[in-house]
Amino acid sequence: MQSCRDVADLDDVLELSELPSGRSWNGAIAFLDRDGVLNIGSSDYVNNAAELIVIEGVAKAVGELRRGGYRICIVTNQSPIGRGFWDHECLADIHAELRRKLLEQDKDAILDLILYCPYAPWDNSECRK
């Protein structure tokens, strides 16, 4: 049971966009959770792109991290997939909307990588955080 990568296979080559102002990358990575950090979470889950509400100021914070030389990696548990509530494509739509909303507010708020664990807690997957 391994983790999954948004819109690509886990083993695919990761193509990174340039950091702002042509800054060189020194290997710094900011690992961020999604629900409750970037967007408002819900006990009933964020079930579709229309339900996604980005927390105020988050896009600027992500942009500032990138302007400071950090790559942004989102790590998130997404057990609704393992519970059968929705599929990987639904999650890809939610993540596309997250990316769109962040970039709408700050052109540098690029998410370099999103890793997620689709398994339910009782699956005892090591990829759950």
Go through each PLM region and give its residues.
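Short, charged, low-hydrophobicity "junction" segments
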Residues: 9-12, 42-43, 89
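Non-cysteine beta-strand/loop elements that form the S-adenosyl-L-methionine
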Residues: 30-35, 113-117
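Basic, amphipathic juxtamembrane/active-site segments
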Residues: 43-60
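Substrate-recognition element of Asp-dependent hydrolases with the DxDx(T/V) motif
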Residues: 58, 62-95, 110-126
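Conserved hydrophobic residues forming the short capping helix/wall of the S-adenosyl-L-methionine
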Residues: 98-106
